[in-house]
C-alpha cells in the first residue's frame, strides 16, 4: 500500500457462507475480522485517505419490514458478527488515523452483467438466485427452500435483492462522495422491496418447467425478513438504480451460467 502510494481502498474480501460460518467460526474470524484488522494496520503511515467497506444487512438481526441505518446492530449469526466487528474496527481506526470511510450494508446481491460477460464463478455460498441459475441448466432441476415456518406471509424468508451491476455503481459513487465531501457514511444498499424465497422460486418455475421444490429445515444464522430503507442512501449518493427488476436479475444470472457451461 505504501510502496504504490494507494490513496483509496475498496475492501470486498471476506468469506460469506452463512451456514459455513456457524460451523467454522475460526476460519471466518481469521479471514473476515483479522483480515480487516491487518488491512487497516497496513494503512498506517500511508497515503490512504478513503476506504469503502462491503458490510451486510445481516448485522441488523431479526427485523420486520424496512430497516434504516439508525437501527442498532444485533447480529444473530457468526457471519453477521464478523461484518459488525469489521465495521467497528474501521470506525475506530478512522478516529485514530483521520481517514474517511464508507460502509455499504449490502442486501442480497444477485445477477450478472447484462452483457453476459461478467459474473460469479463461486458456487458454494448457497445464494438462492445463483443456485436457481445453476439448476436452470439441468434436465431435472431441484430447488431446496430452507424453512417454511418463518413469521412471513408464505412462511419463507424475505430478502431485498439488488443487481450486482447497480451495486458496483454504488461503490464508484460512494468513493467519489468521500473524495468530494470528506465525510464518512454508513448506508444500506438495496432497492427497498422484499421478495420471499417462494416468490422467487415461483418466478423461476415460469422460466424453467418441471422444477422439484424441496422444503428443508431452517439454516442456522438465517433471519426471517429484511429489506432496505433507502431514503438516506438515495439522498447522500444521489443514486438511482438501472436494473431494479427481479425478473431481469434472474434472467441475467441464468445467462451467465449458460456462458460458463459453454
Residue ranges and their predicted role:
Residues 62-63, 74-112, 130-140:
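Active-site Tyr-X1-5-Lys
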Residues 131-262:
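C-terminal substrate-binding subdomain of Rossmann-fold SDR/epimerase-dehydratase oxidoreductases
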Residues 14, 24, 29-36, 52-55, ...:
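Short alpha-helix in the Rossmann-fold core of NAD(P)-dependent oxidoreductases
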Residues 27-29, 76-84, 118-130, 160-161, ...:
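Short-chain dehydrogenase/reductase
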Residues 11, 50-53, 102-105, 144, ...:
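Structural signature of the Rossmann-like NAD(P)-dependent dehydrogenase/reductase core
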Residues 35-43, 90, 170, 174:
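Hydrophobic positions on the long internal alpha-helix
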Residues 11, 37-78, 96, 102:
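Conserved Rossmann-fold NAD(P)-dependent oxidoreductase catalytic core, especially the SDR/UDP-sugar
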Residues 1-31:
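NAD(P)H-binding glycine-rich loop region in Rossmannoid oxidoreductase-like domains
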Amino acid at each position: 500500500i505504501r510502496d504504490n502510494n494507494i490513496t483509496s481502498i475498496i475492501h470486498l474480501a471476506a468469506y460469506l457462507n452463512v451456514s459455513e460460518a456457524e460451523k467454522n467460526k475460526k476460519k471466518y474470524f481469521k479471514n473476515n475480522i483479522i483480515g480487516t484488522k491487518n488491512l487497516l494496520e497496513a494503512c498506517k503511515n500511508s497515503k490512504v485517505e478513503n476506504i469503502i467497506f462491503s458490510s451486510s444487512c445481516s448485522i441488523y438481526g431479526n427485523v420486520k419490514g424496512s430497516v434504516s441505518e439508525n437501527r442498532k446492530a444485533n447480529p444473530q449469526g457468526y457471519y453477521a458478527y464478523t461484518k459488525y466487528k469489521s465495521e467497528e474496527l474501521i470506525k475506530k481506526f478512522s478516529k485514530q488515523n483521520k481517514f474517511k470511510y464508507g460502509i455499504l450494508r449490502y442486501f442480497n446481491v444477485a445477477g450478472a452483467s447484462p452483457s453476459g460477460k461478467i459474473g460469479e464463478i463461486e458456487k458454494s455460498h448457497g445464494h438462492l438466485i445463483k443456485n436457481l441459475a445453476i439448476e436452470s441448466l439441468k434436465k431435472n432441476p431441484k430447488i431446496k427452500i430452507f424453512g417454511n415456518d418463518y413469521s412471513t406471509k408464505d412462511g419463507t424468508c424475505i430478502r431485498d435483492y439488488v443487481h450486482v451491476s447497480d451495486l458496483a455503481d454504488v461503490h464508484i459513487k460512494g468513493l467519489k462522495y468521500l473524495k468530494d465531501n470528506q465525510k464518512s457514511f454508513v448506508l444500506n444498499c438495496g432497492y427497498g422491496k422484499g421478495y420471499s424465497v417462494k416468490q422467487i422460486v415461483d418466478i423461476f418455475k415460469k422460466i424453467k418447467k418441471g422444477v422439484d421444490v424441496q422444503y428443508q429445515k431452517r439454516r442456522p444464522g438465517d433471519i426471517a425478513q429484511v429489506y432496505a430503507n433507502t431514503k438516506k442512501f438515495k439522498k447522500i449518493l444521489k443514486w438511482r438504480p438501472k436494473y431494479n427488476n427481479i425478473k431481469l436479475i434472474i434472467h441475467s444470472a441464468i445467462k451467465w451460467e449458460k456462458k460458463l457451461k459453454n
